[in-house]
């Protein structure tokens, strides 16, 4: 579906927290209408946005439903997202639904899921560190006698969260 009937260029900003304030301010200074989306009604970026949507940035379907009400009033020209987690997928889904140029859903999923990211790097010849995908049940036998190791979840919600170093089997088990 192509958005028509509008001469108001609008940018969708996924999240309105402290780290998004400058993005919202800059978009406004460039003359764009800013639709800010955040689950926290007290998000500081909301005070700069033209339109505020209180919704989780993880819930693409709910956000798309909200944006549907606005699509005839504004021309969506971009989706901004400073996250490296699940909101990247939300941004891709919004872009696809409203035919806004942006990252593909597959690329977004590859970016968010570290296993998929490494597989994609390998497929396209992009160097990346050696890794092993394993389940919780396998980990004690797979890595025995190869310590220290770095353990990182495939789906980290915030940057480097969940990373740990195991120097022994006991540390790996805990």
Label the model's feature ranges.
Residues 62, 89, 141, 159-160:
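Glycine/Thr-rich phosphate-binding loops of Rossmann-like dinucleotide-binding domains
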Residues 34, 102, 128, 149-150:
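Hydrophobic beta-strand scaffold residues
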Residues 96, 108-129, 136, 140-142:
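Glycine-/Pro-rich loop/turn segments that contact NAD(P) or position catalytic residues
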Residues 52-58, 131-136, 164-167:
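Short acidic-hydrophobic, aromatic-tinged amphipathic segments that line or gate anion-handling sites
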Residues 130-131, 148-174:
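Glycine-rich phosphate-binding loop of ATP-grasp-fold ATP-dependent ligases
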Residues 1-107:
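ATP-binding N-terminal substructure of ATP-dependent carboxylate-amine bond-forming enzymes
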């Amino acid at each position: 579906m192509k958005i028509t009937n509008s001469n108001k260029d609008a940018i969708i900003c996924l999240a309105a927290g402290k780290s998004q304030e400058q993005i919202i301010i800059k978009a406004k200074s460039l003359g764009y209408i800013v639709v800010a989306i955040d689950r926290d009604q007290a998000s500081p970026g909301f005070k700069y946005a033209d339109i505020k949507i209180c919704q989780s940035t993880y819930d693409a379907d709910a956000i798309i439903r909200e944006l549907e009400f606005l699509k005839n009033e504004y021309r969506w020209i971009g989706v901004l997202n400073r996250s490296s987690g699940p909101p990247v997928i939300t941004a891709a889904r919004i872009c696809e639904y409203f035919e806004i140029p942006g990252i593909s859903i597959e690329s977004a999923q590859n970016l968010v899921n570290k296993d998929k990211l490494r597989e994609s790097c390998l497929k396209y010849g992009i160097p990346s560190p050696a890794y092993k995908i394993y389940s919780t049940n396998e980990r004690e036998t797979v890595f025995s006698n190869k310590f220290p190791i770095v353990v990182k979840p495939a789906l980290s919600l915030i940057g480097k969260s969940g990373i740990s170093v195991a120097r022994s089997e006991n540390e790996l088990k805990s």
